[in-house]
Amino acid sequence: MTITSILPMSVEKSIEKFINQNVEYQKLREKFFPNALLREDVLGLLDRFCTVVYFPIENEDNNGFHITDVPFAGGTPHNFVYINTAQTMEKQVFTAAHELGHIWNVDQFVLKDLGLENTTERCEMIINRFAAVLLIPEGIFRNSVDSVLDDYLNPDGRITVINLLKLVVVLMNQFFVPMKAIVLRLAELNYISLENANDLLGNSHLDKVKIEELVQSLIADFGYVKFQVPSMKKWIDGLSEKLDIAEAQHLVPQEKIDHIRKEFDLARPPVLATEMTDTLQFTSQEGAKDNDN
């Protein structure tokens, strides 16, 4: 689908303001996700704000979706996110960031902050831009592009399609996001035109299939083995333990429990030997590093 417009930088600055004002997120980044780039850590971040259902559905274009305000324990509303793990890992990463934007209502913050009209298309564009800002922050991205750009530019300052695709693949590897995210980021930050972005995405005169084949070949040539690989993960946090409780207390029909275990490849819990409950000495080393200094 042809990209017809890109949100202005004022939207990006509003998104950055939201991120900087999100105290809970900043504390989580500092404690659990200290790396400058989130990459796959965004999946762990998403887990902290909702229940994530990881399950593969092959031959399905939908990368994932968000269900809000589902009645949970005690009747409290709860968020669920589905991630299609038959998609490649880099697509799962971007999907997780996108759905996190929905949970945080980033679009509503930006609309109010900038006084923009609330439309479905604009909201989705804002959420996609949020995912880009979260995973591909401007400062780091510019430094990354500038550090390798001379390797790919012609002497006249122009760049061939093949070299631009090489640059895209290198950036995909650094930020662990899909090709489309990098191409759009290059356009959002004015490295390339929207017309050229559509060219690379196969939305104009360039053959989309041939571009995708070339990108896959470059990924293999560069040794980026984590790309273009689906995880096929089947997991819901705490599902196994909850099934054990439901089975022990006869809360759910046994055939339903067996069916869920089969679908999620969950083995029956082993019978633990009594010595597994023995206690061992474990000495906390909190503050030990500071004391050494």
Placement of each model-derived feature along the sequence:
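Active-site hotspot residues in diverse enzymes, especially metal/ion-binding acidic/histidine motifs
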Residues: 1-293
